[in-house]
């Protein structure tokens, strides 16, 4: 139960990163636009007072502000996409659900535009709809609901007369219904929840602010190895605290308030839950990297210099710290605990110095300049002396403990592992193999710094191999693996997903189970599209176009072109003279190659891999030659209909160079064994 919960929390944390990733672009526009309009920068650069420059600056500020003003909707869309595996249909469903929920709540509570003008009312105008203000939490709730609707109904089958609405088209319809129903309990209970949040944040921030900022920095840092820090900081950044802007609107959340105060040029009061990162990320951790380099064995210093130099520069410029932190987290957990304490003390120190700094992405030099130095609204220069003190503390504490306790930090290992050289195109294949192959992957995801994989069997994961491939660390919690590859993690995940989906086939062909049950048959380079190949019906039943198959791997022709048959009898016969190329271990899929070189995959039913061979009887074996009409497989049609998603059977030409299929009987209607199904050219 605990492991499953951790996996779910990981996915939620990663999903929150998608909308958060938009904020740096918005912050860049807003910060530069605001700085150009400010007197401080105009004093040094008088030419920017030009009317044209000022108009552009105003447009930049407005363009950046609109993102922050619509964060709840952006979170709804982003969370839906993140939790639905990146499918855009979930985002459409989230948008539909978001506007329906807000419109229904507004009408149910009889909210008028006049009510919205009262900041204390708890109402707001969202996309022009007077409604209850649910903030970012409301967006997250809708996003999660949209993802649930997608995962539940994306492959639903409906009667033929409602076939147009089957599959993904059904998701927004279902979301419209569920969000309408959700609006009523939200309208009744959310005001109480919001009052509770306000009371909690007021007590936390006003009564015990020093303790609160220390604990925030300390706990957030401790959660980073588990990837759960995004969940922890979200309410502090987007909900806790309140401030009234010049227009009379109530703004919630430390980051939202900070950005709004920067935009208006107001006196800064926000930033308490962000500013402590700057001394640590710009000074402390780079100094720790220097200590790790100095304590490395002489023969390893050249390699360590490259690793630590890159990680330190990444931390300094962007505030991305995981590549550096994971280099000592597992071998020296005491150092990481001290690092977390120092992080909390950094928040407390800047709070006591009355410094107010914020960021849109992380506490690196780029955000420091854009949102600290250029606006010049706080004592930003105090970060430098605090940071220098932190650099000294980090360097000597790390160096002393590494030597005293003989920690095996990078460059101090008893025996250096042999790094594996893998090109950019080979790396995703190598990582996939190190994870135990695609049959071992239950769920694949990534965030900015880490590859997140839920595996079926942890014993099949080659942890040292992942480190040799460039992972600075590998975290294991139950069957959830996190490999720290830094900023390239998301690209590795994307390419691994393509390989698993059969979109990239460069290595020897595998026939393994994955999330989409993708089965890839290696393409025979000798096959040529100049030949004509006749394929006869291997089943008796009703012909259906691939586009109507409720599985996007087949319907979007990721594996190749073809057709599907909804069987009326439980037999599969050879569609041509040829040879059995492969048989899937669970007997639900079979690959053949014809005497003329055409390669064909017959996939009996959808999601039938989960039946583990139950209901299937084989009559052939791999490598066996067959004649057209020979019996290949018997299957229990009733059992499949009762235990699988569908009995519909895709018949796929797996050669990408063969796309011209002539369907002699058409793509609809009944067909029998031996009838000509199509001609491939």
Swiss-Prot record:
Residues 551-655 form the PTS EIIA type-1 domain. GO terms for molecular function: D-glucose transmembrane transporter activity; kinase activity; protein-N(PI)-phosphohistidine-sugar phosphotransferase activity; protein-phosphocysteine-sugar phosphotransferase activity. PROSITE patterns: PTS_EIIA_TYPE_1, PTS_EIIA_TYPE_1_HIS, PTS_EIIB_TYPE_1, PTS_EIIB_TYPE_1_CYS, PTS_EIIC_TYPE_1. It comes from the Bacteria. Its main location: membrane. Keywords: Cell membrane, Kinase, Membrane, Phosphotransferase system, Sugar transport, Transferase, Transmembrane, Transmembrane helix, Transport. This is PTS system glucose-specific EIICBA component. It comes from Staphylococcus aureus (strain JH9). The gene is ptsG.
């Amino acid at each position: 139960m605990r492991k499953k919960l951790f996996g779910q929390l990981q996915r939620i944390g990663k999903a929150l990163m998608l909308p958060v990733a938009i904020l740096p672009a918005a912050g860049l526009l807003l910060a530069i636009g605001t700085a150009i309009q400010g007197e401080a920068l105009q004093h040094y650069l008088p030419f920017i007072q030009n009317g044209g420059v000022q108009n552009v600056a105003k447009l930049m500020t407005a363009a950046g502000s609109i993102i922050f003003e619509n964060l709840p909707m952006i979170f709804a869309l982003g969370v839906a996409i993140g939790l639905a595996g990146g499918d855009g249909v979930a985002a459409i469903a989230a948008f539909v659900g978001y506007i329906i929920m807000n419109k229904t709540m507004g009408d149910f509570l009889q909210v008028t535009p006049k009510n919205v003008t009262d900041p204390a009312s708890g109402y707001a105008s969202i996309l022009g709809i007077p409604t209850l203000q649910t903030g970012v939490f409301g967006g997250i709730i809708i996003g999660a609901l949209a993802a649930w609707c997608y995962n539940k109904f994306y492959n639903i089958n409906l009667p033929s007369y409602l076939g147009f609405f089957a599959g993904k088209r059904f998701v927004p319809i279902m979301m419209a219904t569920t969000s309408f129903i959700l609006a009523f309990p939200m309208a009744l209970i959310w005001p109480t929840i919001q009052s509770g949040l306000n009371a909690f944040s007021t007590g936390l921030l006003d009564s015990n602010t020093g303790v609160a900022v220390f604990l925030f920095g300390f706990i957030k840092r401790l959660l980073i190895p588990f990837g759960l820090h995004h969940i922890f900081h979200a309410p502090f950044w987007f909900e806790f605290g309140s401030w009234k802007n010049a227009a009379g609107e109530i703004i919630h959340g430390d980051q939202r308030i900070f950005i709004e105060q920067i935009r208006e040029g107001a006196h800064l009061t926000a930033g308490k839950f962000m500013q402590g990162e700057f001394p640590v990320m710009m000074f402390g951790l780079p100094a720790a990297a220097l200590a790790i380099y100095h304590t490395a064995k002489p023969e390893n210093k050249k390699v360590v210099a490259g690793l630590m130099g890159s990680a330190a520069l990444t931390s300094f410029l962007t505030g991305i710290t995981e590549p550096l932190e994971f280099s000592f987290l597992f071998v020296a957990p005491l150092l990481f605990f001290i690092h977390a304490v120092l992080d909390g003390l950094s928040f407390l120190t800047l709070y006591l110095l009355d410094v107010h700094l914020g960021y849109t992405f992380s506490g690196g030099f780029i955000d420091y300049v854009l949102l600290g130095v250029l606006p010049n609204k706080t004592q930003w220069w105090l970060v430098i002396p605090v940071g220098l003190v932190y650099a000294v503390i980090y360097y000597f504490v790390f160096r002393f403990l590494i030597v005293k306790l003989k920690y095996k930090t990078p460059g101090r290992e008893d025996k250096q592992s042999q790094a594996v050289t893998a090109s950019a195109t080979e790396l995703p294949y190598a990582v996939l193999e190190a994870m135990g192959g695609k049959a071992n992957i239950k769920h694949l995801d990534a965030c900015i710094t880490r590859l997140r994989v839920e595996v079926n069997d942890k014993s099949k994961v080659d942890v040292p191999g992942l480190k040799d491939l460039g992972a600075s660390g590998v975290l294991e919690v139950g069957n959830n693996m996190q490999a720290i590859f830094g900023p390239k993690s998301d690209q590795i995940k994307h390419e691994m997903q393509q390989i698993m989906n059969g979109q990239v086939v460069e290595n020897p062909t595998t026939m393994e189970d994955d999330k989409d049950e993708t089965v890839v048959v290696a393409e025979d380079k000798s096959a040529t599209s100049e030949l004509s190949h006749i394929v006869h019906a291997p089943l008796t039943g009703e012909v259906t176009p691939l586009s109507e198959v409720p599985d996007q791997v087949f319907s979007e022709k990721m594996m190749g072109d073809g057709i599907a048959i909804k069987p009326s009898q439980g037999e599969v016969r050879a569609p041509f003279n040829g040879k059995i190329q492969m048989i899937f271990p669970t007997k639900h899929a079979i690959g053949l190659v014809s005497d003329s070189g055409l390669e064909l995959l017959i996939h009996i039913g959808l999601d039938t891999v989960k039946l583990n061979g139950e209901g299937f009887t084989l009559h052939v074996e791999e490598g066996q030659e067959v004649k057209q009409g020979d019996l290949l497989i018997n299957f229990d049609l009733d059992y499949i209909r009762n235990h699988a998603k569908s009995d519909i059977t895709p018949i796929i030409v797996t050669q990408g160079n063969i796309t011209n299929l002539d369907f002699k009987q058409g793509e609809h209607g009944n067909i029998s064994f031996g009838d000509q199904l199509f001609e491939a050219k």
